[in-house]
Structure formats: C-alpha cells, structure tokens
C-alpha cells in the first residue's frame, strides 16, 4: 500500500467519524460530563455531611503520609477504573456502529453514490474496521485523559485546602503520561483482540436484509444453545467448549483495561503478596496477550469475515 492509499484511507476514517458524530464525538463528551457531575455531587454531599471538611482534610493528610508505592497503587487503580468506563462504553458504541455502517448504505441506496467514486470496496470496508479498532480507541482515550486531568485538578484544590503538596501527593505518584502510553498500547491491542467479534458484526451488516445487530447476536446464541443441548443429550453433560462462553470471555478481556497477573503477585495460596501496578495492567501482560495463540487465531477469523464482507459489498448492487 503506497502513501497515496494510506492518505486516502485516513481521509475515509475521518469521514466515518464525521458521519457518526454522536458515536465518536458526543458520546465521549457525555461520559466525561457524567463522571464529572457525579464527582462534584459526591463532593457536595460529602461537604454537607463533613462540616468544615475536617474528615476530608484529615483523609488527604493521611493519604499524603502513605508510602509512595501505596499512593501510586491507589491512584493507578482509580485512573484505570475511569478508563474502564470509557472502554466499555466504546465497545457498545462500536458494536452498533459496525452493525449499521454497511447496512445503512444498502438501505438508503447511498451505496450507489459511494461506488461511483474512485474508491474500492476493499478500501471502504477497511476504513470501517480500522475506525473501530484504531480510531475509536484514540478518541475515547482522549476522553479518558480529559476526565483524569479534571479529577486531578479537583484533587489539587482539595490538597491546597488540606495544606499538602499536590504535586508530590497526587501528580507525581499517579505518573499519568506513562499510564496514558500504556493505555494507548493496551487499547490498540484490545482492539485486535476484539477483531473477530467486530468483523463478524461487520459481516452481518454487509448482507443482512434487516436488523443486522439482531442477527449478529442471535446466530451465536442459537449455536451456543444447540451446543449445550447436543452435548447434554449425547453425553448427559453440559459442554465446556461453548461458543457463547468463548465470546463472553473474549468480550470480558477486551473491554476491561486490566489484567491481574496472579503468578507475579501472589504465592501458591493465591494470597496477595506483592500488590503493585501490574495488578491492573502492564506492558508485559499486554505483550503476552498480543503474541498469544488466541490472539492470532482471532485475527485469522476476523480476516476471513472481513474478506467475506468485501465480497458481499461488491455484490450489494447486483440485484
């Protein structure tokens, strides 16, 4: 792929964002607003209960007296939890975006206009799947960074009231720039992890006569139910290798930016021995996930669905 093709692909990805402003622009803003609103409401309620903020100030002072490692761990957990909210909202948004992106072109016949342009169907489908696994994580990461900075500014104001240094208490231990780079890397890897699910939904959008999201959900559900019935009536036991369990496991690992590495932080009794930031996410866990067999099997399945989507896209106007 030459530079001209990459430039055209980038323009088409930006077009996807421009045509879906609620999904990729307003939804992150709304999530930021809700988190900020609930944070402010919690502080207001706390101020009404805690007259003159005696307990609040004492709590901040006690937090400042903790070891740096403890403060770093607590702040890391809070910021990762915030990013998890954005990741989960993004997953829902991307699912509905992919379910409608090719189907809507066929429904309103705008596909005729796009096919009249010097843009291949391969490029069109690629722009949509790349928007889901690359551009969407970048947009929602921007929302994550914004709300984290706003909450840290609120914490800074409270630390001044408590008479502690906000930079050594909050900003330093939080190590935000390093965490943002990790979230960026992890978000892109999670996008690849979810590629088979995203590609399946895109595939349904390319051929479904109506309600592609319903078809995308019902087909694996029915297969999973059939698997359970078949295994039960043939072996009188429920199957452990169920397609629905596999999908739910992949979704669970793809929408939560956290990986608890028990082999690194626990002893043989599963008792927490060395709690650290690796409880939530680390470069090691992300790299291990990237080069795992499950990841590459999923990518191969996703490529098959993408190729099938291109095939149906090319024949969408034949009838």
Please place each PLM-identified region on the residue numbering.
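Secretory targeting signals
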Residues: 39, 43, 62, 70-96, ...
């Amino acid at each position: 792929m030459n530079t001209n093709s990459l430039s055209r692909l980038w323009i088409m990805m930006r077009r996807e964002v421009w045509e879906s402003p609620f999904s990729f622009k307003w939804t992150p803003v709304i999530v930021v607003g809700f988190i900020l609103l609930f944070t402010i409401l919690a502080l207001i309620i706390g101020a009404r209960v805690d007259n003159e903020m005696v307990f609040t100030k004492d709590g901040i002072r006690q937090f400042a007296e903790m070891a740096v490692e403890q403060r770093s761990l607590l702040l890391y957990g809070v910021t990762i939890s915030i990013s998890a909210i954005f990741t989960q909202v993004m997953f829902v948004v991307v699912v509905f975006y992919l379910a409608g992106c090719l189907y809507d072109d066929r429904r309103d016949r705008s596909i005729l206009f796009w096919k009249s342009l010097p843009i291949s169907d391969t490029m069109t489908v690629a722009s949509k799947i790349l928007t889901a696994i690359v551009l969407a994580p970048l947009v929602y990461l921007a929302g994550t960074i914004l709300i984290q900075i706003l909450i840290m500014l609120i914490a800074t104001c409270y630390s001044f009231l408590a008479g502690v240094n906000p930079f050594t208490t909050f900003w330093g231990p939080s190590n935000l720039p390093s965490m943002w780079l990790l979230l960026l890397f992890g978000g892109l890897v999670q996008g690849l992890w979810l590629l088979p699910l995203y590609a399946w939904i895109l595939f349904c959008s390319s051929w479904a006569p109506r309600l592609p999201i319903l078809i995308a959900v019902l087909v694996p559900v029915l297969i999973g139910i059939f698997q359970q019935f078949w295994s039960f009536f043939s072996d009188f036991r429920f199957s452990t290798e169920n397609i629905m369990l596999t999908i739910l496991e992949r979704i669970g690992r793809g929408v939560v930016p956290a990986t608890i590495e028990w082999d690194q932080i626990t002893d043989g009794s599963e008792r927490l021995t060395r709690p650290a930031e690796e409880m939530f996410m680390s470069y090691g866990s992300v790299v291990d996930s990237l080069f795992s067999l499950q990841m590459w099997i999923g990518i191969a399945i996703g490529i098959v669905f993408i190729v099938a989507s291109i095939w149906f896209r090319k024949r969408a106007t034949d009838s």
